[in-house]
């Protein structure tokens, strides 16, 4: 038994979609979450800067005595995950491979779409992972840079959000049967995305998919939390306004949480 928390990092609030699924599947595990909303989005930034920011988040989580770090951010996974994983002596998990694997299982026509930040799409990481495992699958990637600002400003239900999603996804409509939400912010726009793509298109939440891998690693390294502990204390940190973060988090997690401000 290991009661240390699991650390989550993201460029902002998007990683809460992963946390929500972890709380549902593994309610006995403690969580420490750091969202760098003050510098979001990461997607348009240079690789060097993304790597620097990611390491700052990682080092913060290490001060919290975490037993595992989850990159709840596709952009950080694409740019820095391999380097961080090689440098640390605790498990470090990204969200890309679980999402890619789920897309392979989902598609029936071999036509998969991937939406993400400009950096995630430019890295071509999803296509590489998918076609490494299933070379016959055709992957269409599309950058959606306007999605993260919508979520970070808590405008997910606005009319402008609907227009932006509709306009952004137009190149993929009718061309795929599976769509990977290759940014953990995007599930917060899921109802609009599903409406635009149509009911026949399966949406893959890369963050939610990675929770299964978290469970596997906890078992493999024998670092599961206390199964008998009914109430666990989670800690949430943001580099931006805690009130905005708290508002979005409370809606998504369906519970009131305390959010602390941190300067990196």
UniProtKB/Swiss-Prot annotation:
Which UniProt keywords are given for this protein, alphabetically ordered? Answer: Cell shape, Cell wall biogenesis/degradation, Isomerase, Peptidoglycan synthesis
The lineage's top-level taxon is Bacteria
Query: Which GO BP terms sit in this record?
Result: cell wall organization; peptidoglycan biosynthetic process; regulation of cell shape
Active site feature: 73 (proton donor/acceptor), 183 (proton donor/acceptor)
Tell me if Isomerase is a UniProt keyword of this record: yes
Task of the protein: Provides the (R)-glutamate required for cell wall biosynthesis.
Listed under subunit, the entry gives:
Homodimer.
Q: What is this protein called?
A: Glutamate racemase
Source organism: Streptococcus pyogenes serotype M1
Gene from which this protein is expressed: murI
């Amino acid at each position: 038994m290991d009661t240390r928390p699991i650390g989550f990092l993201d460029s902002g609030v998007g990683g809460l979609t992963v946390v929500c699924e972890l709380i549902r599947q593994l309610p006995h595990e403690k969580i420490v979450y750091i969202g760098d909303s003050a510098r979001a989005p990461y997607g348009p930034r240079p690789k060097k800067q993304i790597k620097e920011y990611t390491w700052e988040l990682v080092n913060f989580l290490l001060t919290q005595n975490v037993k595992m770090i989850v990159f709840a951010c596709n952009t950080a996974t694409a740019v820095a995950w391999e380097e961080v994983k090689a440098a640390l002596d605790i498990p470090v998990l990204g969200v890309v491979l679980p999402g890619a694997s789920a897309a392979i299982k989902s598609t029936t026509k071999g036509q998969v779409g991937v939406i993400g930040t400009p950096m995630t799409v430019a890295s071509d990481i999803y296509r590489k992972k998918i076609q490494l495992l299933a070379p016959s699958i055709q992957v269409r990637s599309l950058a959606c840079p306007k999605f993260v600002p919508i979520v970070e400003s808590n405008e997910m239900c606005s009319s402008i959000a609907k227009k932006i999603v509709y306009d952004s996804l137009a190149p993929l409509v009718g061309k795929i049967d599976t769509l990977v939400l290759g940014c953990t912010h995007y599930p917060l726009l899921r109802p609009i995305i599903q409406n635009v793509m149509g009911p026949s298109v399966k949406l893959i939440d890369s963050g939610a998919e990675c929770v299964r891998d978290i469970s596997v690693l906890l078992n493999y390294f024998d670092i599961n939390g206390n199964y008998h502990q009914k109430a666990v204390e989670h800690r949430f940190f943001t580099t931006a306004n805690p009130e905005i973060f708290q508002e979005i988090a409370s809606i998504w997690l369906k519970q009131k949480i305390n959010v602390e401000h941190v300067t990196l």
